[in-house]
Amino acid sequence: MAVNIYDVAHDLDKGIRETPEFISLQDAYREVNENADAKAKFERFRDVQVTIQEKQMTGQEIDDETVNVAQQVAQEVQENELIVKLMEKEQAMSTIINDLNRIIMTPLQDLYNVAND
């Protein structure tokens, strides 16, 4: 019987959204967005992350100013309980995504392991 892999993917999407980890992440994100100070700090943190990633991806050097700003913003974020909570929830969700990715990649790993035997 043929499986529509896209239907399976949509079921996985729905399942992820129903996990306690995702629901907790949504709640934590809502709490950050409802607090003006936390929201501003979190947005600044994300902007700095994107800037650093863009520089890394394009081979640009990360200058001292960017490093200093990143350190300052990271310190501010660590001092905000709402953002710390959000990051903890993100980490829990990341663990699930990594586990799912490992499961999804198993058929390819098995294929190449058999081919190499």
From Swiss-Prot:
Transmembrane segments: none
Pfam families: Com_YlbF
InterPro entries: Com_YlbF, YheA/YmcA-like_dom_sf
NCBIfam families found in the cross-reference section: PRK13676.1-2 (NF010210)
Family: Belongs to the UPF0342 family.
Protein's name in the database: UPF0342 protein lin2326
